[in-house]
């Protein structure tokens, strides 16, 4: 039997957004799906059993890793592997620890990317708002729009999410290029990206946040799609916030669709009144905004898939 610890503290960065001391749906699902091959404990990481072999979670410091002599696998129960986790494993010098992650919400994330793109290209949010007030004039007036059919899009990221986005864009009649890591490894430099995306209409970010992707999409990159559309469904920090805001506010970019943000509420009270950026994106009509819902957090079907994919990894480890 595997000894497994689910790191649950109620922190949105762990597993569920409101993990409880007992009866948590994720814990119950894991016991149902893998209780025959694993024993489970759950709670903050500092309550991890001494003989724990598998940790399910995303936040652990080097000292905890160094002390966990029997730990051989960390399963990150979402798509992106946290940058701090990679740094902690490296600092602990535990080269025997494998990091695994899952893609249970790839379809959901891809769908929100396509929805944001279409809404941004056609000004759907503004049209909706005006018609709710009884205003039909946009139907009869010239209005700014961008047609996707026949235009060119670049998807930054070739993973489970990026590949789904690319297939959907092709179905919309777009010419699509997906970019993974540079051929020689390492990181993309801005001038390299510019040469690949220059003259296109759409840039969609679907990459993990790592040291080499932080701030990757800067003003130079955004200027390569003049009057274009930028969509971000991965991590806000892959973009230079000021560069994006400035180009949206002065019209150098036609529009943006954003599901990820620089400021996330940390309390229930903040959830009711918390601007998502350090700049007032909420004041821009050419920005379509959603509150980090692409991953489907809390949706029963998505959470069930999360548990099933984690259980599948555990079964692989148990063989």
Question: Language-model segments: what does each one mean?
Answer:
Residues 53-132:
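Phosphate/diphosphate ligand-binding glycine-rich loop within oxidoreductases
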Residues 1-54:
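N-terminal glycine-/charge-rich "phosphate-binding" loop or analogous flexible N-terminal tail
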Residues 64-70, 87-94, 220-227, 247-252, ...:
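Short, conserved loop/helix-junction motifs that constitute active-site signature segments
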């Amino acid at each position: 039997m595997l000894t497994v610890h689910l790191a649950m503290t109620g922190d949105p960065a762990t597993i569920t957004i409101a993990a409880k001391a007992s009866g948590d749906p994720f814990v119950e699902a894991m016991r149902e799906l893998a209780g025959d091959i694993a024993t489970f404990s759950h709670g903050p990481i500092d309550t991890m059993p001494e003989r724990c072999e598998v940790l399910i979670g995303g936040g652990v410091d080097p000292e905890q890793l160094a002390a966990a002599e029997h730990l051989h696998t960390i399963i990150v129960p979402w798509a992106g592997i946290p940058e701090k986790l990679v740094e902690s494993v490296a600092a602990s010098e535990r080269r025997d620890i494998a990091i695994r992650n899952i893609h249970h919400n790839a379809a959901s994330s891809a769908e929100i990317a396509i929805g944001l793109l279409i809404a941004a290209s056609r000004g759907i949010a503004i049209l909706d708002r005006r018609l709710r007030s009884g205003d039909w004039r946009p139907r009869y007036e010239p209005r700014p729009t961008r047609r996707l059919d026949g235009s060119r899009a670049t998807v930054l990221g070739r993973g489970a999410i990026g590949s789904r986005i690319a297939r959907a864009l092709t179905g919309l009649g777009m010419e699509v290029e997906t970019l993974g890591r540079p051929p020689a490894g390492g990181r993309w430099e801005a001038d390299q990206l510019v040469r690949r995306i220059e003259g296109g209409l759409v840039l969609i970010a679907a990459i993990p946040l790592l040291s080499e992707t932080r701030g990757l999409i800067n003003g130079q990159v955004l200027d390569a799609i003049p009057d274009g559309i930028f969509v971000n469904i991965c991590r806000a920090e892959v973009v230079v916030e000021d560069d994006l805001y400035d180009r949206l506010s002065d019209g150098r970019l036609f529009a943006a669709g954003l599901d990820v943000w620089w400021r996330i509420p940390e309390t229930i009270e903040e959830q009711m009144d918390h601007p998502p950026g350090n700049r007032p994106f909420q004041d821009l009509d050419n920005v379509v905004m959603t509150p980090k819902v692409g991953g489907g957090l809390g949706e029963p079907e998505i959470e069930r898939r999360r548990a099933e994919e984690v259980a599948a990894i555990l079964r692989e480890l148990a063989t």
